[in-house]
Amino acid sequence: MSTRNALLIAASGLAMASAVAFAAESPNLGRAATPEEIAAWDISIGPDGVGLPPGSGTPKQGEAVYAAKCVACHGDKGAGAPNDRLVGGQGTLPGDKPPVKTVGSFWPYATTVFDYVRRAMPYDESKSLTNDEVYAVVAYILNLNGIIADGDTMDAQTLQKVKMPNRDGFVTFSRGK
């Protein structure tokens, strides 16, 4: 064995031994999450609506929430600027031009919109909206896209019944089942 290979093997062994020693001596940082903390983040909503919380909201109520919490990033009536558009784009997915992906043209399930808004919006205060505010702002966005009427109320029962324009625009597959 050459000196170079011997040094390389020795250096590798030393690096591994150091890593093991460091891991054994590292400080105990953090703590285990409590059941309450875990429950607070267990908020996933599936396409079928399982897990939707109590609450409700209308497009009119959502307009006020949108004006206070969303317009700075998504523009007047969801038109975009500086961030993503939320409205329009219907009919742009198939075609020669780049698609305009919005809630009204791309998202397949209204429950997924709820889930995303609830956990990630507003961008600088994620998870800060009440359930009623989330239902309301989702109702407003759906209304702007012509998916629900002005007088509709979104809640755990009605939201899962909304048929999004692109619901059938995705290919489903099974993972070996």
Summary of predicted features, one role per range:
Residues 60-67, 79-80, 107-110, 128-131, ...:
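Sequence context surrounding c-type heme c attachment/ligation sites in exported
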Residues 42, 54-81, 87-88:
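Sequence/structural segment immediately N-terminal to covalent heme-attachment motifs in c-type
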Residues 28-65, 122-125:
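Electrostatic cytochrome c docking/interface patches
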Residues 9-18:
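Bacterial N-terminal signal peptides
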Residues 46, 67, 71, 75, ...:
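Sec-exported extracytoplasmic/periplasmic mature domains
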Residues 19-23:
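Sec/Tat signal peptide C-region and signal peptidase I cleavage site
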Residues 124-177:
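Flexible coil segments in periplasmic/lumen-exposed cytochrome c-class electron-transfer proteins
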Residues 63, 79-118, 122:
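Gly/Gly-Pro-rich "capping" loops immediately C-terminal to redox-active cysteine motifs
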